Structure formats: C-alpha cells, structure tokens
C-alpha cells in the first residue's frame, strides 16, 4: 500500500490544479479538469462503477456493497485544487527514504531544518515526500485523493472484507471556500461522509470555525495637497481609522485552540478609494456574531464622522461550525476514532482552525468529519508528507467501512 500511495501522490502532484478566488466559474480554473479526467479514468480502471464527472468539476463514483446487511452508505471526499497562497506550477516532488532526522536539502539554496520545523523529528526512519523548494507539494489534498483511491482498490482486490455501499467524491475549489457550492448531496446519496483533508497522523476533526468574509470600502475626495485644507477627504485615513477599531489581541498570530479572530487579509488604497478585506472566525456562534457586530459598530462610528456614504461594509457568512450538525450523529466520529485505535493510532480531536468542505456539507444534510491525510507545512515550499502516514490513512478508511458493516444488522 505504501508504494501505491507514493506513486499516486507524486503523479497527481505534478498536475497543476491551483484554484483562483477571483474567478466566478466552477471550477474556478479549467486546469482542475486535467486531474479530474485522470482520476475518472483511474477509478474506472480499478473497478469502481457509476462514475460521473459534471461540468462543474464534481467527480462521483461507487463501490457497491458486498454484504446483505443494511449498512449506511458512506462517502469519502478529497479536493483536487491547491491553494492560491503559493505556486503549484511545475511541482517536482522529491522522495527521501529512511529520513535520518537531519537537515533536508530541498535545492542548492534552500534547506528544511528540524531547528525550524521540529515536527520533522516525528518522522525519523520514514519515507518523506517533499518539494524541490520552488513550489508547494499539493499533499493538501492530493494525499487524500491517493489514500481514497488506494483504499478502494484494496477493497476491490480483497472482497473478503465486507462493507456497505461506498461513494467517492473528488471536488474543486475547496481552497477558495467554494468546494461544496454546487455539490449535489442528493445525487451523491451518502448517509455520512468523511473528508480526507487533515494534517498529521491521528487528526480527527468535527468542529470547525464559524466563518465570514468582510469587505470595507471607504470613499474620499482628492484635492491638491497644497490647497486641501477643509476640502480633502482621505479614504486611506478612514480605512486606517476603521482598522484601529479592531481588537489587537484577537488576531491569528495571537490566538490558538478555540480562540477566534478578526484577520485583515488585504488592503489597497488611494486618496479617493480604499478597500479592506477581512475574515472573521470563531468556533462559538455567539462570539462569532459579536465580532461581526463589533465591525458594524466600527463602520457606524466612521460614518458618523465622515458621512454615511463615506464607508460601506459588506459581511457575508461563509460556513458554520459543523460540530452543531455532527453532534447528533456523533457515532460517525466514534467509529473513526475506533478505527484509528485498532491501528494503534492515537486520535487527536482538536477543533479545526479553519474549515473543510465538510463544514458546508454538514449544513447541506451530509454530516462530514475530517480525517488526517498526512500533510505538514501545507500551502508552501516546506510542505511534505510521510508515506507511512498516508498508508495509515488508507488503512483507517478500510477499518471504517468494516466497522460500519459490523455494526449493521
């Protein structure tokens, strides 16, 4: 299994599938279809059926049940796109067998050191797949894709392992928050699902942020600075005044665990026009609403000083804490936990400081916790993944489907 997941990850990683948050199409980039077509053919080759790929880039497939028991239909999902944060063009994965715990020379100018990334010490003796230091790797989430396909292939080759009906989905645009926007839950037809989109060994996540995006626009009046007194209105100054109303401690670089934040993601401005882009995140729904109210109050304060038309604020909720929808069917988390424990994996059930496709899918009627895929240092040139962790993730999938079958009547 180890060599299969390595081969698949490296092959998938070389296909550029970066999404684009400025695009209004689905998928946001046509090149995501380059991998989707490869995966569609591969699913057919290994023996899955009912394979569909729609015009929006959603690839579904089925492994039919091989038991007479009434087992829930279980789905496994991963996304094909890579982040907009770092280039995914010309990815050249490097294989490092039997890692010795020392520095890793990614290229002649770049070293990945345990001094900077101490978690490397967890992987001594293992096979690591790294970047060449010029791109991301794309283990987020091509490791998840490799694990799901390898697990399905293993189940097909070992029919003595009993399971209910299984559904597979590979989806676009997760990295820009639009993965489930055109996901047809009814057509997918699963009772429960799991995303294989987590990080290190043992991650099992069923709580995510509540999330919103905020755009603030300020409008000023440009006048020659030599004659600007009582005439110029500076949009940049207004934008700064708004930002100064934001909490200084509730920011990503100062928070962890269940602590939420207001994050200024982007700023651009001139005298006449300035824009601020924020994301708001909190696991607690009440605190989430309070953060949005704080921003509305800051906007009202600036408007009172400069005029109502001088500032506009748009707040759009993006997704909610999936824990609210998973808690009533907590047994799906318990089964994943038991699957890990049977494989001597210690489950790590920390809240996701982010969101997955499962965050939205859970609110669309498909409860979907998140399981580790193995990636470390994702979204950058120091990204890597352990082949042994990918193999374990594949085994977790196989254990989960067996446990569902064993519990059924």
UniProtKB/Swiss-Prot annotation:
Gene name of this polypeptide? pepT
Gene Ontology BP annotations: peptide catabolic process; proteolysis
**Where along this sequence does the record place binding of Zn(2+) 2?**
140, 175, 379
State the family named in the UniProt similarity comment for this chain: Belongs to the peptidase M20B family.
- Keyword hit for Heme: no
Chief localization class?
A: cytoplasm
Q: A single Pfam family, by name?
A: Peptidase_M20
Please list the residues that bind Zn(2+) 1.
79, 140, 197
Q: Which organism is it from?
A: Lysinibacillus sphaericus (strain C3-41)
Listed name of the protein = Peptidase T
Positions of disulphide bridges: none
